[in-house]
Amino acid sequence: MKMTISQTKQPLASVEEHTRVTIKTLFQFLHAQGQGDYLGEQVTQLEHSLQCAYLATQSPKHGNDPEVILAALLHDVGRFIPAAEKMGKMITPDGKYIGRQSHEALGESYLRQIGFSEKVCTLVGAHVMAKRYLVATDQSYYDALSETSKRTLKFQVSHLSLLIFSIFKVY
């Protein structure tokens, strides 16, 4: 159960300071890790995150929802927080690094621990599953993915998952 500010019995200034520090820390992680290339793509991690947030604002259904936009911005937080170093790396047979295993679960857990809303946390945790679903049910979505994104699917999806999604689509 989420507590309201009055239930925390902390002075408002203390809550505001905690929020400021949390946001500053998150953006320091994003800025520090976001300058390098994003898995071999033509954009940095920071640019990718900002693009996703921008695209979320363009959604006819969710573009006015700040939690959706925030989740889009932070969807890859599990790639760049310090705890990500402990997560397994996804390496292609030819030796290319293409991301961290279970970064979505790590990101969801991290955001929940620092007090983000359930909606933001759930969306961050579900973004890889959403990609799997879209790939399984929409060929044009798959066709529009970059080669790097397609390679990450080999680590993120199984043929059984594709079969299950296909069955759900029928029903």
Task: Describe the role of every protein-language-model region.
Residues 54-171:
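Divalent metal-dependent catalytic cores for phosphoryl transfer on phosphate-bearing substrates
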